[in-house]
Amino acid sequence: KSASIGVAAAGPSGRILVMVETHPGTAWVVPRLVKILAKREVLEVSLHPGSQASVLISDLVAESVEFVPLSTRAMGQACADFITWVNEKKRIAHVGQIELDAAVANAKTRFSSEAELWDRRDRNIDISPLVAASGAAHRWALLEDYDVMDSIG
């Protein structure tokens, strides 16, 4: 029913700041990403091709927007990270967006093999803001911890 773009950045006190933009449908997503990419320094665009986000791939390719495909395993890591960062480590900061607050309040998880994932099967509850925010925070943390010198022999 709706789609969300999640962004993550360095937040206050070493926390990860997450923000989302959510609108009905998916037609708006790629044009909005193109505008964001033109105006901001974006480290990466990522999506889970095993989800409804797969409908965006052809438009992303047509607009020459490079993206990182996230596996179900990576989405499980993002879910686990976000739960831990919110509940235990207090590592997430956000600006109090209604869509994200509602998604967090109503979200449930499920297991696929041994991975805990956000349960998106209930169409009456839109958790796309939470899925987008957790994916963005997970990828930000990985990129934040990456040292380019580690890849030089």
Where are these regions (language model features)?
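RNase H-like, metal-dependent nuclease domains and their acidic two-metal-ion catalytic environment used
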Residues: 1-72, 76, 80, 84, ...
